From Swiss-Prot:
Protein name: MTOR-associated protein MEAK7
Chief site of localization: membrane
Region feature (Disordered): 435-455
Domain (TLDc): residue spans on this chain: 242-410
Length: 455
């Protein structure tokens, strides 16, 4: 590991393509130039902050600078210099962006602690907080939220803390136990732990790449925002504000197949379509894979990924790619267990079967359930949902909600286009009759045309 610190800038530069190295050299020349435009051979923290301006929080600029400055140069006369040389600059960027897990771990370790002595978990936590905040900041600053506007001007602190906790939850200590919360903050972290963390948590390296590519405006062609943040297709004239923010979108997108990460199409929203189960059914059926998200009245945000189109029928549907998730107060995903195939359920207008939308578990005991009596649901898990091994997702086992969204993922395939253009009430007379008998209002009555049957 000691050798990694003294690898020459020339060797590190070989990890970049010639045109990339030229861009790295150009940025160094800008940073190291005096006010008169003369290159000095090194640059200071003040010069770096002046160049970055408002693109990154000052704390992250300082961490990047410290990481560069702590790379041991081959020229020992520069070892005590408090500025950054070309060799250190190139070596840091090369190892951080293109290095092995060991090399990336070393650069991250250099960025984490600025004090002598052992690095503790609280130092890693503070670094992770700065990293997550920097990603949210720079994507906002560079106007690369791709349509995911926040309900407030900034990403909510609760969302940032949930992302930080999720990243730290994958950190494993020498005794094999994972990070469990505040009681672990005084545990010592060695470089091997950081290397393993960087290896097992791809978001760490991904977020550092965003900070470098967008914060320093370096090697921008190497970073495609669509791989991180899907495009939000919800053109509602500025009226729509999603339950999700950019960090929760990044988290959920990372658990999807590549073809589902490019763009998300808003299919249904209570904000736009009202509290209507028939509206929900008519908007989400035959739309391909989708993501449904709810926020209960206690502020818990959770939902599920449906791997195929929803169909109104009294049988379970879907496959083992489906999963449940929570976003607030904590971020987590819950995959299939193999215990049963109760992945997805959508039914309406049946007198002998449950009417509503469900995922996981069994009839009347779903891991996630949205009742046809819209605005009510349950999440039952004692001790866990049999299908997804998920805990109770909502604050209360039986919950009330006002906010729900369903997103279609990727482009709508031809096999789904043209299907199910009718409302579920048009195609299911029994459902229509049952609704009228129960005295429930038909919110869409008079607001739409009933489509004609296709030949």
């Amino acid at each position: 590991m000691g050798n990694a610190k003294s690898l020459s800038g020339q060797k590190m530069a070989s990890r970049f393509l010639p045109e990339e190295q030229a861009e790295v050299d150009k940025l160094f020349d800008v940073l190291s130039s005096s006010e008169g435009g003369v290159a000095t051979g090194t640059f200071s923290l003040e010069a770096m902050k002046s160049h970055v301006k408002e693109a990154l929080p000052p704390a992250m600029v300082t961490r990047l600078y410290n990481g560069m400055q702590r790379v041991k140069p081959t020229d020992r006369t520069l070892g005590s210099c408090r500025s950054v040389s070309r060799e250190q600059f190139t070596a840091f960027l090369s190892q951080l962006l293109r290095g092995s897990c060991e090399e990336k771990g070393l650069m991250v370790m250099n960025m984490i602690s600025d004090a002598e002595g052992p690095t503790k978990t609280r130092d890693v936590q503070k670094f992770t907080e700065d990293l997550v905040a920097s990603v949210a900041h720079v994507l906002t600053h560079r106007h690369e939220l791709r349509g995911w506007t926040c309900r407030k001007s900034e990403v909510p602190p609760d969302s940032m803390q949930a992302m930080v906790a999720q990243l730290l939850s994958e950190m494993k200590f020498q005794d094999g136990y994972k990070f469990q919360g505040p009681q672990c903050l005084d545990q010592v972290c060695d470089q091997a732990m950081i290397e393993e963390w960087v290896f097992h948590v791809p978001h760490v390296g991904m977020f550092l790449s965003v900070v470098v590519h967008r914060g320093l405006c370096l090697l921008g062609s190497s970073f495609d925002p669509s791989t991180l943040v899907p495009e939000c297709l919800a053109d509602q004239g500025g009226r729509f504000e999603s339950i999700l923010d950019v960090l929760s979108v990044i988290y959920l997108s990372s658990h999807l197949a590549p073809e589902h990460r490019q763009r998300w199409r808003l299919l249904f929203s209570t904000q736009l379509h009202g509290q209507s189960f028939s509206q929900l059914c008519s908007h989400i059926t035959s739309q391909g894979p989708s993501l449904l998200v709810l926020e209960d009245r206690d502020g818990y945000v959770f939902g599920g990924f449906a791997s195929c189109s929803w169909e109104v029928k009294p049988q379970f549907q879907g496959d083992n790619r489906c999963f449940l998730f929570s976003i607030a107060p904590r971020m987590a995903t819950h995959l299939h267990t193999g215990y049963n195939n109760h992945f997805m359920y959508l039914n309406y207008g049946q007198q002998t079967m449950p009417n509503g939308l469900g995922m996981g578990g069994q009839h009347h005991y779903f891991g996630l359930w949205v009742a046809a009596d819209f605005g009510k649901g349950h999440s039952k898990a004692k001790p866990a949902c049999t299908t997804y091994n998920s805990p109770q997702l909502s604050a209360q086992e039986d919950f009330l909600f006002d906010k729900m969204e369903v997103w279609g993922l990727g482009n709508l395939l031809e096999e789904y286009e043209g299907k199910n253009k009718k409302s579920v009430l048009d195609s299911n007379p029994e459902a229509r009759s049952l609704l009228e008998i129960s005295g429930r209002a038909r919110h869409s009555e008079g607001l739409r045309e009933v489509p004609r049957d296709e030949d």
